[in-house]
Swiss-Prot record:
<feature type="signal peptide">
    <location>
        <begin position="1"/>
        <end position="32"/>
    </location>
</feature>
<dbReference type="GO" id="GO:0007218">
    <property type="term" value="P:neuropeptide signaling pathway"/>
</dbReference>
<keyword id="KW-0106">Calcium</keyword>
<keyword id="KW-0929">Antimicrobial</keyword>
<comment type="function">
    <text>Inhibits calcium transport into spermatozoa; it does not bind directly to calcium. Binds to calmodulin. Inhibits the growth of microorganisms. Seem to act as an antibiotic by permeabilizing the bacterial membrane.</text>
</comment>
<dbReference type="GO" id="GO:0031841">
    <property type="term" value="F:neuropeptide Y receptor binding"/>
</dbReference>
<dbReference type="GO" id="GO:0007631">
    <property type="term" value="P:feeding behavior"/>
</dbReference>
<dbReference type="GO" id="GO:0042742">
    <property type="term" value="P:defense response to bacterium"/>
</dbReference>
<keyword id="KW-0732">Signal</keyword>
<dbReference type="GO" id="GO:0005615">
    <property type="term" value="C:extracellular space"/>
</dbReference>
<dbReference type="GO" id="GO:0005184">
    <property type="term" value="F:neuropeptide hormone activity"/>
</dbReference>
<keyword id="KW-0044">Antibiotic</keyword>
<keyword id="KW-0112">Calmodulin-binding</keyword>
<protein>
    <recommendedName>
        <fullName>Caltrin</fullName>
    </recommendedName>
</protein>
<dbReference type="GO" id="GO:0005516">
    <property type="term" value="F:calmodulin binding"/>
</dbReference>
Length: 80
């Protein structure tokens, strides 16, 4: 009866793998608008490009802060 249930680390691994596979299907760069596009469309393209760049630059700092908060600084521990 217990053999049919999967452990939570296995389920988390499967979910993470599924998210990675789905992430590969999404375009990471916005497609540039053609020359005949309206000024509004050009503006939306440049705004989305700027937003993606800003998020890409900000996220490593956010992740580092999050990890240091929850994991802590393990390098400063002394062994007794």
């Amino acid at each position: 009866m217990m053999a049919g249930r999967r452990s939570w680390p296995a389920m988390a691994t499967v979910l993470l793998a599924l998210l990675v596979c789905l992430g590969e299907l999404v375009d990471s760069k916005p497609q540039p608008s053609d020359e005949k596009a309206s000024p509004d469309k050009h503006h939306r393209f440049s705004l989305s490009r700027y937003a993606k760049l800003a998020n890409r630059l900000a996220n490593p700092k956010l992740l580092e802060t999050f990890l240091s908060k929850w994991i802590g600084d393990r390098g400063n521990r002394s062994v007794k």
